[in-house]
C-alpha cells in the first residue's frame, strides 16, 4: 500500500505504508522519499546483548556499533520531515573488567554533533519490573533512555494531545484520599469557624479528585504543616495565615516530566523480549506525530511501534531484518486489528 502526500507543490508517494518489511533497514530507507516521515521511534539491537539474528549489535567494538547505528540515522534524517522527530531507545552494557560503558550517551553525543541534531529530551524509561541479577556489588538497572532528537527547533510537539490520551483520571480513585486532612484539623490551631470552612473546602476538593477532575492535590493546614519553604510571602502563605489552610490542586497528567514508569513487555513462545511494549509507545506518539501522520520504526522487532501507531490513528512503516520477528509482528498487528 502506498499513500500520496501532497505538500506545498509536489506529490510524494510513500512505499511500504502500514507494512512490516523484511530486510536491511539501511537499504530499505533508501527506498523512501525525502521529507515523508513524521517521526521515528525505535530501539535497535543492544550491543553484544543477545543474538537478534541481525548484524547490528554483533560488532567487535562499541565504536563499530555506534558507526553502524549512525549510518542508519543519516538516512533517517533524510526521510524525516523538517518538523519531524527521531527517538532512539538504547540499552547500556556492563563489561567484566570495565564496568558500565555509557553506550547510549556516547551514541547520542556522536549523532548530535556529527549530524547537527537538536536534542529535545532524554526521556528516562523507568522499568517497573526490571530484570533481576545476582550481583552483590551494584544495583539493579531499572532505567533506559529514549533520546528525543529533532532536525531543528521548529519540531512538531503536541503536549495537549499527549495529555488527552493518558489513562482516564477517574479510574482507580482512592475512596480514602484526602480524609486524613479532615482528621488533621483537630490537631490544628484553627478556630471553630475556620475548621468548619476548611472541612467544607477539603470535601469539595476530594469530590473533584474522585470525579477525575484533578490528577492530585495537596493541603497545608496552619499549625500542622510547615509554612512555605524559605518563608516566602505570597498567595499560599497568606491563605495559611488568614484562613488557616491552603489547597494545591494538580490538574493534568502525571507524565509531564522526562520519566515514564512502565513495565517491560514480553511475548510467550518466542525468543524475543519486547524491550518496550506498545502501551509505552502510545504515551509518546501523540507528542511527536500528528493524527494520520507516519511513524517509522527501522528496527521493528515484535511490532510494538506499529500497534501503538494503529491504536492512535497513525500510519506506520516497519523494517526488520529477522524474518521470525517479522512473522511475530505481523501476527500481533493482525490480532490487534481483529
State the predicted function of each range.
Residues 2-328, 334-336:
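Core catalytic lobe of class I
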Amino acid at each position: 500500500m502506498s499513500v500520496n502526500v501532497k505538500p506545498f507543490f509536489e506529490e510524494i508517494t510513500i512505499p511500504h505504508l502500514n507494512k512490516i518489511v523484511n530486510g536491511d533497514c539501511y537499504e530499505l530507507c533508501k527506498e523512501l522519499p525525502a521529507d515523508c516521515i513524521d517521526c521515528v521511534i525505535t530501539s535497535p539491537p543492544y550491543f553484544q546483548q543477545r543474538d537478534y539474528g541481525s548484524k547490528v549489535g554483533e560488532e567487535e567494538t562499541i565504536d563499530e556499533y555506534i558507526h553502524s547505528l549512525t549510518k542508519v540515522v543519516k538516512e533517517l534524517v533524510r526521510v524525516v520531515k523538517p518538523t519531524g522527530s527521531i527517538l532512539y531507545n538504547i540499552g547500556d552494557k556492563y563489561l567484566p573488567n570495565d564496568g558500565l560503558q555509557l553506550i547510549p550517551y556516547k551514541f547520542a553525543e556522536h549523532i548530535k554533533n556529527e549530524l547537527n541534531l537538536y536534542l529535545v529530551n532524554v526521556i528516562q524509561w523507568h522499568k517497573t519490573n526490571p530484570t533481576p541479577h545476582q550481583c552483590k556489588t551494584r544495583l539493579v538497572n531499572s532505567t533506559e533512555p529514549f533520546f528525543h532528537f529533532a532536525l531543528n527547533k521548529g519540531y512538531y510537539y503536541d503536549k495537549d494531545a499527549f495529555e488527552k490520551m493518558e489513562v482516564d483520571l477517574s479510574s482507580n480513585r482512592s475512596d480514602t484520599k484526602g480524609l486524613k486532612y479532615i482528621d488533621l484539623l483537630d490537631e490544628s490551631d484553627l478556630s471553630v469557624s475556620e475548621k468548619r470552612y476548611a472541612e467544607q473546602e477539603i470535601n469539595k476538593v476530594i469530590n473533584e479528585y474522585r470525579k477525575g477532575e484533578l490528577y492530585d492535590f495537596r493541603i497545608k493546614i496552619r499549625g500542622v504543616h510547615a509554612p512555605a519553604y524559605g518563608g516566602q510571602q505570597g498567595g499560599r502563605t497568606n491563605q495559611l495565615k488568614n484562613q488557616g489552610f491552603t489547597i494545591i490542586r494538580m490538574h493534568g497528567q502525571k507524565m509531564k516530566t522526562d520519566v515514564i514508569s512502565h513495565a517491560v513487555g514480553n511475548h510467550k513462545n518466542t525468543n524475543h523480549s519486547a524491550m518496550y511494549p506498545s502501551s509505552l509507545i502510545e504515551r509518546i506518539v501523540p507528542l511527536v506525530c500528528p493524527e494520520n501522520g507516519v511513524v517509522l520504526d527501522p528496527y521493528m522487532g515484535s511490532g510494538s511501534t506499529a500497534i501503538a501507531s494503529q491504536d492512535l490513528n497513525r500510519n506506520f512503516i516497519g523494517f526488520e531484518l529477522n524474518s521470525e520477528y517479522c512473522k511475530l509482528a505481523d501476527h500481533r498487528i493482525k490480532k490487534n486489528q481483529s
